[in-house]
Amino acid sequence: MVTIRADEISKIIRERIEQYNTEVKIVNTGTVLQVGDGIARIYGLDEVMAGELVEFEEGTIGIALNLESKNVGVVLMGDGLMIQEGSSVKATGRIAQIPVSEAYLSRVINALAKPIDGRGEILASESRLIESPAPGIISRRSVYEPLQTGLIAIDSMIPIGRGQRELIIGDRQTGKTAVATDTILNQQGQNVICVYVAVGQKASSVAQVVTTLQERGAMEYTIVVAETADSPATLQYLAPYTGAALAEYFMYRERHTLIIYDDLSKQAQAYRQMSLLLRRPPGREAYPGDVFYLHSRLLERAAKLSSQLGEGSMTALPIVETQSGDVSAYIPTNVISITDGQIFLSADLFNAGIRPAINVGISVSRVGSAAQIKAMKQVAGKLKLELAQFAELEAFAQFASDLDKATQNQLARGQRLRELLKQSQSAPLTVEEQIVTIYTGTNGYLDSLEIGQVRKFLVELRAYLKTNKPQFKEIISSTNTLTGEAEALLKDAIKEQMELFLFQEQVEKN
């Protein structure tokens, strides 16, 4: 018979009591009432907060957006096909955040910062909230450094500064993405980190942009965030905020960043879809009442930081698509009122062969002129004035049969100036090359040439100046001014190249 010793039993009980861990865990849970169309309605989750992440039984993550008296409306970050009615959901106590690091450069990722380029995982030790508050007034300083796009029409007449928000607006197929990608290509060697956010685009279009950037060596300083047209609305809505969080990471590390949102119309449509499915009351054009806040809180994150914070910057180029040139629609007017100016691309100009199809008359930059270098200011003022007068005269000349000599000369000059603004895609020009081009046009050196010869002459002039007068570039880049010496060099180069060009043309004719 086994004898039970009381002291042994009490010893075992004492050991067990010592090992007992009195950890009490409270989990905020709920039950799925209904699921479908990327939306789930949850009963319970009493303590959940707006914007909090919730986790479903089978692993899908969602964001609690509607906090109602009887249920919680959750948008799903995924298709949610495996979620079943009656399954449990738990609140995570976290809001959406993504990992951030230098390793993201040259990669293509989705809205959750997961790589989608098949080049393996991205290592990151830090993370950042997708929705961070924008810098306050004291944290900023006014824009004063230029961000060159490499496009003559923009850098001369609608200049952009580091930390500015400049809207690119126009109909479909007018070259909006081309303007944005050319700007990325022009940042090579400028120590600017670029983030390109593609929202609701065709996968083939995004692949084309990535290929262009890779071929030109621009991917090494670029991050592409892509959520294509077949992605869930929630991820299309989040993608711009993910891009902004990545750009902010570099901005707060005293770096300069450029972010392109292509395009915010698609993000607004994704948000409208989510809101209508959540049964939020629709407003103008069926968009929810807070669609302005959707874009303002995103674009306010672009800033030029104060010297105390290291003078980093984040320049935003949001793109908005219009329907047959209607700038007074809801989303275009909202974004125009948030940004510091807009570049308007016209379908008529595009079809007339003027590319980039920038309508200089209604495009503005509200703060960029403070960032323009002096040399560009010296030549660009005259260009804008002459083009404005030309546009007025051209409209008038359609009705007048006989025009006096002065008017004919002005029309001829205007046509040549319009010609010098044309540029091929993926061929950005340096500031020095732009100054040469504008100076040649506004000072009448192109008036003697046929319109068809203008671009050929300018290409040859830029090459001639680069080879034979390298000191011109040195003067401009060191002083940022078109000095008397630089102007003399330029005049000599134009004269020499013009003689050579006319001689070559004569030889070709014969």
UniProtKB/Swiss-Prot annotation:
It catalyses: ATP + H2O + 4 H(+)(in) = ADP + phosphate + 5 H(+)(out). It is an enzyme of class 7 (translocase). It is a peripheral membrane protein. ATP binds at G170, D171, R172, Q173, T174, G175, K176, T177. F-type ATPases have 2 components, CF(1) - the catalytic core - and CF(0) - the membrane proton channel. CF(1) has five subunits: alpha(3), beta(3), gamma(1), delta(1), epsilon(1). CF(0) has four main subunits: a, b, b' and c. HAMAP family: ATP_synth_alpha_bact. This is ATP synthase subunit alpha, chloroplastic. It comes from Phaseolus vulgaris (Kidney bean).
